[in-house]
Amino acid sequence: MTLPLAHAFLEQAKTDYSTFEIIRKISDQPSSQWLHLLQMTLEKAAKAYLAAGNENYDRLRESHRVFRRFARKLPHNKRVRDSLNMNAAELKQHIKNLETLIDDIERLVPGRDNYGPTAEYPWRNSQGGFYTPCQYGFEDIVSALNNSARGRNLLRILNRVLSDESWHIAFGITSPN
């Protein structure tokens, strides 16, 4: 079955998020595993909304770091503001408060400009050896997600992004049927 690009990204983001939720609950799973899934969920969810706004497919493929750019669009959407019971200034501040955590998660992607830590591939340490994601704790991010209002708020926003049909409609993501 083929889908419009925005819907395809959204469906994959939902699947990644479901897997994230399952793995995150398993106490002996390395945090790198579920952080990788969370990063991919944020990326694909943002790309769904950006694709619905007619962003070019090739441009979307150029970067893994798109959720912050997308999140900054939320205060400009009346339906989103209304659903969160916030005015534009409040939502803008709310998103701004999440940006450090969003950036930390988006930096988990390996690439030319990222020499570690990443949630996916080993990276070199200062002594010439390597760290491996499955043995690295990612304590700052894990603590923020598990124990802070920022973490809870980011996951609440992400749940809306993935599941709130009114948000989908507001951004032009329509059902493929």
Where are these regions (language model features)?
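Charged alpha-helical initiation segments
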Residues: M1-M40, Y49-L60
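Long, charged low-complexity segments
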Residues: M1-P4, L50, N54-N177
